[in-house]
């Protein structure tokens, strides 16, 4: 039985005017994901994936570079306006927002969505250096 030839599907680039930038700023790394309004990921970048390793991942500059790389990845979608959702206490919170603003996006709203426990799990013990 002959198989039908497999055709590669053309990837259709959709144009999105408004997007949502999800910034996950932990103490060790920063993850930047830009989605459309429905939550479908359009592009993402991390400080670790941008060439920073070890303790340099957890710097504001690494978060800035990750935001610039993520912005370059989603330029082809035609996003003009961004709503920013920041999660976590990490050092890359502010520098990521500044980098997205400098990349040419108009930031319409900044929301802090850091999960706060209503006395849930016990936190890690304090460091003794």
From Swiss-Prot:
Q: Which Gene3D superfamilies match?
A: Ribosomal protein S11
Task: Output the GO biological process annotations, alphabetical, semicolon-separated.
Answer: translation
User: SUPFAM superfamilies, alphabetically?
Assistant: Translational machinery components (SSF53137)
Q: Which domain of life is it from?
A: Bacteria
Cross-referenced NCBIfam families, in alphabetical order?
A: PRK05309.1, uS11_bact
Function of the protein: Located on the platform of the 30S subunit, it bridges several disparate RNA helices of the 16S rRNA. Forms part of the Shine-Dalgarno cleft in the 70S ribosome.
State the similarity comment.
Belongs to the universal ribosomal protein uS11 family.
Q: How does it assemble?
A: Part of the 30S ribosomal subunit. Interacts with proteins S7 and S18. Binds to IF-3.
Q: What is this protein called?
A: Small ribosomal subunit protein uS11
Species assigned in the record: Yersinia enterocolitica serotype O:8 / biotype 1B (strain NCTC 13174 / 8081)
Taxonomic lineage of the native organism: Bacteria, Pseudomonadati, Pseudomonadota, Gammaproteobacteria, Enterobacterales
């Amino acid at each position: 039985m002959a198989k039908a030839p497999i055709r590669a599907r053309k990837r259709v680039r959709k144009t999105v005017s408004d997007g949502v930038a999800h910034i996950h700023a932990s103490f060790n790394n920063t993850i930047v994901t830009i989605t459309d309004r429905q939550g479908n990921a359009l592009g993402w970048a991390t400080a670790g994936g941008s060439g920073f390793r070890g303790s340099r991942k957890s710097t504001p500059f690494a978060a800035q570079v990750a935001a610039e790389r993520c912005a370059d990845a989603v330029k082809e979608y035609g996003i003009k306006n961004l709503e920013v959702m920041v999660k976590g206490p990490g050092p890359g919170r502010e520098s990521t927002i500044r980098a997205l603003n400098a990349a040419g996006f108009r930031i319409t709203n900044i929301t802090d969505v850091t999960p706060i426990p209503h006395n849930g799990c016990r936190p890690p013990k304090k460091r003794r250096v």
